[in-house]
């Protein structure tokens, strides 16, 4: 039940450190969960940043599942979902307050939301309310850390300044996680078809009584 509340996609239920490639970033994420009580007490979060497809969301999901296993309340969502959910609501404040009540809030893919004044206002309201709650926040983004630190747009700058105050930047690099998954699937597909063709050929031989030379 907690995972249904936390995640928007069932595939995320199985994201865990045991299945993750052993990297420095993964080790730091594991340390974060192992020291959760201190992280919570000191309001320390993560800013997972880096190129597209390197596994930032997966790492955040691993952290979420590790904490959910300990009955800690976690919500992982993104601003496109938040903005869509809030648009028809008369009481937007209660929605934002509800997000602030989770022991850990994970905001995925910062920077992919709409760039309108309304959307940026919602983003700031959620971040600012979380800031004032004193609870940890994890953010993932494809935006370079340099851009976050040197943003000149006033509305974006106040958002990024809040995040950088709350979250420790952690670079997630290496090869594209999505490309690696696609490559792995392609390899499995080739193996499957090769096995299928071999099996089909053997069946034909058995049925006709012929042999190949």
What does each model-identified segment do?
Residues 41-61:
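Walker A/P-loop nucleotide-binding motif
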Residues 27-30, 64, 68-104, 114-121:
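Short glycine-rich substrate-engagement loop in P-loop NTPases that contacts/grips substrate
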